[in-house]
């Protein structure tokens, strides 16, 4: 995996929080950029898993294998809004937007509720809330060294272990980033 320069920040990139981002929701976050333009940016945190006692309260998912469905905190903004990342290219999901190869955002939730996902390989990530930046804000944070950039993939979004995602992505970038992947969360423990 190669670290991307800031000029390549676009939909489908990953933002990886620097170890300097300590405390708060963005500490050790890996964010999938879903939109980036001169007007601002938004993305979804991939590695802040939410444990839910009764996910059926959100959607009737009794026809899905639990290993294919995950819930996470997408970010601090509008936490009551649910955004769906999925791997279904089904015609029933045609109102979805492809973020990176085989990773789609949104769509009509009815294709899920009606069990229209046809492949056993298709996965879903329900994100509560999102992360957003006003025009110029993300650029400023990037120049301050608060974020690193890497390419996203379906494997990273749906298959990687959320609790190891931050360190794994940094490790895969190599060099000084691999060294950063071993920095303890609490520097007093170092």
Swiss-Prot record:
Family: Belongs to the UPF0301 (AlgH) family.
Gene Ontology CC annotations of this record: cytosol
The name this protein goes by in its record: UPF0301 protein TC_0483
InterPro entries per UniProt: AlgH-like
Pfam families (UniProt xref): DUF179
